[in-house]
A protein has these predicted regions:
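Generic detector of leucine side chains in alpha-helical contexts
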Residues: 20, 44, 68, 76, ...
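Alpha-helical scaffold segments in soluble metabolic enzymes
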Residues: 38-45, 79-86, 161, 165-174
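Glycine-rich anion/phosphate-binding loop at the beta-strand->alpha-helix junction
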Residues: 50-53, 57-146, 150
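Internal helix-turn-beta structural module
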Residues: 131-183
Length: 183
């Protein structure tokens, strides 16, 4: 089982390609080599202007086993949401195709080859990669409002390892529960 988390958007600049090997090779943990410099510029521009920017972090769990989670009270999605939304500055979460699922027809959304569910159906992992995205708000401490001192213009890079850790905690908790139940 492997957990990857990376920036897919900083401010208004988003990446389209995911290169998992590139994540640890850049300061903002972007996954798109071509968008990285634009994302970095977005942060530097915000800093120069005395402002801040937020972003979106994508989290992928590869090789997650089937059957983690419960259908009602201990859904895997609910536990990930609770853990990840407890991180300061996280303002939203989506799984798989997320909010865009509201605009799809059932025949489009239920395509098992495309993993629109993000690896979780009915609160239980289905063996596909688990895919989540979390929205990170821009820091509120900015020079534009007269706040002095050192403040990060973007906390997305700092939030990524925290998101990985919270994801790992929930995953291990469900692995232990599953192992106990399946004895």
């Amino acid at each position: 089982i492997k957990i990857f988390a990376y920036a897919i958007q900083i401010g208004n600049v988003g990446g389209e390609k995911v290169d998992l090997d590139f994540i640890e090779k850049n300061s903002i943990r972007a996954a798109d080599k071509t968008a990285y410099k634009k994302m970095e510029k977005e942060i530097l521009d915000a800093k120069r202007d005395g402002d801040s920017v937020g972003g979106i972090i994508e989290i992928i769990i590869k090789n997650a086993p089937k059957g983690l989670g419960e259908p009602v009270f201990d859904k895997l999605t609910a536990d990930f949401a609770k853990a990840l939304c407890s991180i300061p500055a996280i303002k939203g979460i989506e799984f798989g195709s997320g909010f865009s699922a509201a605009t799809k027809k059932g025949s489009e959304q239920n395509d098992p080859k495309k993993n629109h569910s993000g690896g979780i159906l009915g609160g239980i992992s289905n063996g596909d990669d688990i895919i989540m995205r979390i929205a990170v708000k821009p820091p509120s401490s900015i020079r534009k409002f007269g706040v002095s001192g050192r403040h990060d213009p973007c906390i997305v890079p700092r939030a990524i390892p925290v998101a990985e850790a919270m994801t790992a905690i929930v995953l291990v908790d469900h692995l232990l529960r599953n192992k106990t139940i399946c004895l």
